[in-house]
Structures are given as C-alpha cells and as structure tokens.
Regions:
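Select transmembrane alpha-helical segments in multipass membrane proteins
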Residues: 19-29, 94-107, 145-148, 202-215, ...
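Transmembrane alpha-helical segments of multi-pass small-molecule transport proteins
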Residues: 59-60, 128-160, 175-182
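Helix-loop-helix connectors at the membrane interface of multi-pass transporters/channels
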Residues: 6, 87-90, 117-143, 177, ...
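Membrane-helix boundary/coupling elements in multi-pass transport proteins
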Residues: 81, 104-119, 219, 224-232, ...
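Membrane-interface "cap" regions at the ends of multi-pass membrane proteins
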Residues: 1-43, 47-53, 65-70, 195-196
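Extracellular loop-to-transmembrane helix junctions
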Residues: 35-135, 140, 144, 246-249, ...
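Membrane-water interface regions at transmembrane-helix termini and the short interhelical loops
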Residues: 16, 75-78, 100, 147-173, ...
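Helix-loop-helix junctions that connect adjacent transmembrane segments
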Residues: 11-15, 55, 132-141, 169-295
Length: 331
C-alpha cells in the first residue's frame, strides 16, 4: 500500500494534488536527463576511453541504471512524496543518509540548472550566428542568459502541467531532429552495419569500464519523476513507470546516437570532432540541419533547466516541512 511521506507533503502547500498524467510525469525524468544535450559532447568523451566499445559503454550504463531505477521504482510505488530520494533514503537508511542524499540532489539540481543556462546561451548563440548574426554580440548573449534563466522560472511558477507539457514538447523536438540525423548517417553509409564497432575492434576492458562510468552521467535526472509523487494522478503507477520507462527509452536513444556518431565519422574523424553533431550533419551532406541541431540542443537545455527547478523546489519544500530549510519555502 502506498503512503505519503508524512508532514513534509501536507495539504497546506501550493502543490496541486493528483493533476499530472503519466506522460506528464514521464516528461520530468526525460527533460531532466536532457538526452539531446547529453549527446552533444558526451559520446566523444566516452569514445576517448572506450574506443569502438562506445555503444557498449552506453549499453552497460543502461543496464546499471535500470537496476538502480528498479529500486527507486519500488519506493515510488509505496511512498508518494515531493521529497523523492530524500524521503526514500530516510525511510530506508535513516535521517543522516537521507539528509545527505537530499542535499546532494539539491546541489545537483542547482549546478545542473546553472550549466543548462550556460548551455542555452552557447547553443542559442550558435544558432543565431548560423542565421547570420555577428558572433560575439554581447547584448544578444546577455538576452540569452536572461531568457534561459528567467523563463524556466516563470513557467515553473505558473502551473506544473504547463511546465511539464512545455518540457515534453521541447525535448521531443530536439530528439526528433537528432534521430533524423542518425537516419541520414545510416542512409549515407548504406546501412547500419559497422564492422569495427560490432566486433569491438581494439577493445580494452579498462577503457570500457571508464567509458561506462562516463556514460552513466547521461542518465542523471531520471529519478526526478519521484518529486512529482504528490501531484501525479496515479502515483503508485505513474512514478515507477516514469522512472523505468524514461531510463529505458532514453538509454536506447543513447545507444543509437552514439553508434551513429562513430559510424558516421569513423574513429579517426570522430577523435578530431569539436562539435560532433553539427559537424556530422555537414559530413553527410545535410549542412542546413546543423542549425536545427543547435536550436534542438538549446531547447533541451531549456527543458532541463525547467526540470531542475521543478524537482529542486519540491525537494526544498520537503526540507522546509522537516525544519531543514526556511519555513517560508513550505508554502
């Protein structure tokens, strides 16, 4: 039987109870993972360690995170709370471990959100330069910082359903653009078979382990659907499903995109790439698509910043109810 976490999710808060559908809860985890942004550079870093075992690194990372997700899903079935891992770990391991987990997540959401605002400016500026704007325009960069920092906060405050739908739409657009590029790579190469990758040419176990650890970073945030336990219509089902489905679906996306990048460039070309996705579009003869990739990654950064605000604010709400944060945050 599911339970609430206790006083930290009382009805006197501003949270709307039982309003989010399963897709809207799922959008939280997917947006927080920022799959399009993750694929912008992370596969290159994994490649430097794992080589042609790049796709296998992401595959093993997926397996590990599915196991972690299964454990989180069991808590999500039983405890509906805005505090997610803070409450779950407290129930399982005690207050000390719970506080450490909670504050760790809050700091993670904070720094990830800041990184997303920076990424929003970088890729937004890249998109505008591609349209003909002069590079290094400080006024435009300042506007992008303001838009990337304030707009997610405004959307987050307005309504959780609007917030989740916006995150879902933006991430869906960016993922679709990158999948179009992957299809173009396979068509350009005459198929999906890459002998070097599928035979793990030059494979080294040590490099694979390091690559797997790096790949796991791409899954950070998939647990954040747990923070919507109070607001989900059917939290006992939607929260566990969102955690597991987001991990599985985005993990498959990572496998496809990382494989396609190395397939498109080849090992030598990939090692020299500085901006793999836009350069890959040029490589397969779809130069104009690079502009759409830039705006897609910009959307992904925005959606991730929004998801960090949603999850982090609910974590602080739980802290406030437990006396770990100012009481003003409890309403």
């Amino acid at each position: 039987m599911a339970t609430t976490a206790g006083p930290e999710v009382g009805s006197d808060t501003a949270l709307k109870e039982r309003v989010l559908s399963t897709p809207e809860v799922l959008a939280q985890s997917v947006a927080n993972m920022a799959p399009s942004a993750a694929m912008a550079l992370l596969p290159l870093f994994v490649f430097f360690s794992a080589g042609n075992a790049l796709w296998l690194s992401f595959g093993l990372g997926l397996v590990v995170m599915l196991l972690v997700g299964y454990c989180a899903a069991q808590f999500g079935k039983r405890i509906n709370s805005a505090g997610s891992f803070y409450v779950w770990v407290t129930r399982g391991l005690g207050p000390g471990a719970g506080h450490a987990a909670g504050w760790g997540l809050v700091l993670g959401y904070l720094f990830t959100g800041i990184a997303c605002v920076l990424g929003f400016e970088i890729y937004g500026d890249q998109f505008l330069v591609g349209l003909g704007l002069s590079p290094g325009n400080h006024a435009v960069r300042a506007i992008l910082y303001v838009v990337g920092g304030l707009t997610p906060a405004l959307v987050s405050v307005l309504d959780i359903r609007i917030s989740q739908r916006a995150a879902f739409i933006l991430e869906a657009i960016s993922v679709t653009i990158i999948l179009v590029l992957c299809i173009a790579v396979f068509v350009h190469n005459g198929g999906v078979f890459d002998h070097a990758q599928l035979t793990l040419k030059g494979f080294k176990p040590g490099g694979l382990v390091v690559g797997m650890v790096l790949a796991i970073f791409a899954f950070v945030g998939f647990e954040s659907a747990g923070a919507l336990g109070q607001e989900a219509k059917d939290p006992e089902r939607s929260v566990p499903r969102a955690i597991l489905w987001s991990c599985a679906a985005v993990g498959v996306f990572y496998l496809v995109v990382s494989y396609a990048q190395l397939d498109g460039f080849g090992a030598a070309g990939f090692a020299k790439a500085s901006a793999p996705l836009p350069q890959l579009a040029d490589h397969v003869g779809l130069g104009p698509l690079s502009h759409f990739i830039a705006i897609g990654i910009t959307f992904s950064m925005f959606a991730c910043a929004l998801a960090c605000l949603n999850a982090g604010s609910r974590m602080l709400l739980s802290f406030a109810h437990d006396g770990l944060a100012p009481k003003a945050l409890a309403h």
